Amino acid sequence: MAELTTLARPYAKAAFEHAQAHQQLANWSAMLGLAAAVSQDDTMQRMLKAPRLTSAQKATTFIEVCGEKFDAKAQNFIHVVAENDRLPLLPEIAELFDLYKAEQEKSVDVDVTSAFALNQEQQDKLAKVLSARLGREVRLHAAEDASLIGGVVIRAGDLVIDGSVRGKIAKLAEALKS
């Protein structure tokens, strides 16, 4: 995974810098999201691996599949990525682009997994507290996992806060073993 991220980083950075300079972050995020989804299609993956097709043919086919969703700059970007045989990296490029975008917008996606469903008031309160702690706008994504027994697990980028009963039991069991 780290190697793919390393290979994708210069493309994501270039796309981000272009989109930021032209105030098109949302458009480029959508275009790269579409490109990532298209590149993960089984038929498209077979086409991208076809040794008989040139990089120009792969790029042209890729752009045709996406229809008119790509502007001229995005089409040029796809051609450059294809020339370097990096079209399979589009999901990583899109993910890195979105990270750069979130960093620039001072926002963060936070995944909250709880043992029981959180109502809207609880989600709003949690988002407010996390926003104050992280110093960013929080986009909360709530999920439910009964195996947690109780409490919540919060994931925001590299930060993980495990306040679940299952996590506490696991820590206690580890402490008893040592």
Curated annotation (Swiss-Prot):
Q: Which domain of life is it from?
A: Bacteria
- Which keywords belong to this entry? ATP synthesis, Cell inner membrane, Cell membrane, CF(1), Hydrogen ion transport, Ion transport, Membrane, Transport
Q: Which InterPro entries match?
A: ATP_synth_OSCP/delta_N_sf (IPR026015), ATPase_OSCP/dsu (IPR000711)
Pfam families hit by this protein: OSCP
The UniProt entry, under SUPFAM superfamilies, shows: N-terminal domain of the delta subunit of the F1F0-ATP synthase
Job of this protein: F(1)F(0) ATP synthase produces ATP from ADP in the presence of a proton or sodium gradient. F-type ATPases consist of two structural domains, F(1) containing the extramembraneous catalytic core and F(0) containing the membrane proton channel, linked together by a central stalk and a peripheral stalk. During catalysis, ATP synthesis in the catalytic domain of F(1) is coupled via a rotary mechanism of the central stalk subunits to proton translocation. This protein is part of the stalk that links CF(0) to CF(1). It either transmits conformational changes from CF(0) to CF(1) or is implicated in proton conduction.
Record's subunit section = F-type ATPases have 2 components, F(1) - the catalytic core - and F(0) - the membrane proton channel. F(1) has five subunits: alpha(3), beta(3), gamma(1), delta(1), epsilon(1). F(0) has three main subunits: a(1), b(2) and c(10-14). The alpha and beta chains form an alternating ring which encloses part of the gamma chain. F(1) is attached to F(0) by a central stalk formed by the gamma and epsilon chains, while a peripheral stalk is formed by the delta and b chains.
Q: Which family does it belong to?
A: Belongs to the ATPase delta chain family.
Instruction: Tell me which Gene3D superfamilies the record gives.
Output: N-terminal domain of the delta subunit of the F1F0-ATP synthase
Q: What is this protein called?
A: ATP synthase subunit delta
